[in-house]
Amino acid sequence: MRNSLLALAVLVFSAGSLGAQTDGTYGGFSPYSVFGLGQMHQSGTSWNRGMGGVGIAARNHRFINILNPASMTARDSLSFMADMGLGGRISVFSEGDKRALNTTFNIDDVAISFPMWRHTAFMVGVTPVSDVGYNISYRDIDVYTQQRQFTSTGNGGTYQLFAAAAATFWNRLSIGAQFNYTFGNISKKSTIVNGDESYRTMVSGDSLQVNNLSGKFGIQYEQPISGQSVITVGATYKLSTPIIGHSVHYRELGSYDRKRTPSELKDKGLRMGDELGIGISFRRGDDFLVEFDYTRSDWSKSRMDQVSGFSNVGDVVFAPSVGQSFRLGGEFTPNRNDVRSGILHFFRRCTFRGGVYYDQSYYTVDGAHVNSVGATLGTTLPVFRWYNGLSVGLEFGSRGLSSSQVRERYFGFSVGFNIFDIWFQKHAYQ
């Protein structure tokens, strides 16, 4: 009980820390985060991200898999598991002859999982959903006010607190259900400074507090082939539900002409997009895994293009749409049971991962999606006893593949702490 309370305290503290970040430093940075809820954060732990983000059909009793709630029953029956991930990204933006560089760092996930009863398990955690971070400025010449400086800034993000339960039936079929609470603060601001001081500075913006309650369901089925080889198929579905919370739209013209308009988001008809995911994997014992995942998320009825603070301000046409992703990845362990000493034998116990992905954004800009393509590498170094490990992942990718879009080339890294212990064994005394 003491250990359980300690783990829960760490989780709650981490959730508070994530929420606090929305008012300060950037959790993510991209000019495309000006649209909607911002740039969607890649789901999953460092274990998932090292394999290109797959996990819908993955079952592994050594790692927590937060992509499919049905997967949590793949575990040792007496085990307590925890995962905490940190991540950062270096991005280079280019448009014509202009270049810019930015770095970000954020907590990626905190999750704990433990068994409840025979063939059942429970999981609770917190993870980012979207990031808003941008600072865009440019100048033009106006016939009346001479030179004008336009600046648009935004920061914040949304996070998801989740709790899930799952059960396995007939040793092959696993079903899970997850409750999601999404929360966060987003601030967007635009400023126009006129070169002629007789014209007042104009400021407008929105402060958003976003909340959402939703559910996610998952299923996995394992089919043994031969020996230790197993094919697993999996699917997930996340519900589309209303966005609640409140917003304040403000406009300022100089020091005296100020107007603030508060409103409730539940009255705007805003909705989160639903998401359907399917995956298939091939696993051979604990040594080899390869998986392909496809996800589709429909935001076309979210109404974000009709509500201030979510829609853009300017000539660019933003429209919510259907997002998709294709992911392929896997992992390999040379010899997990090699107990010999020496650096070579240590690396034979390590797990090595790789993956590729292609993402299509959940919106269009001037009629075109903002697509991403990337590759990932990862490894887990065994630490101490049981299945404790330190997972490290690298990511190389590019966003804005069309010649008319701002190109973002990024290098990301993630570090995950995988904690495993036996908490629920009963001791016999003579």
Predicted stretch roles:
Residues S14-A15, F80:
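Hydrophobic alpha-helical membrane context
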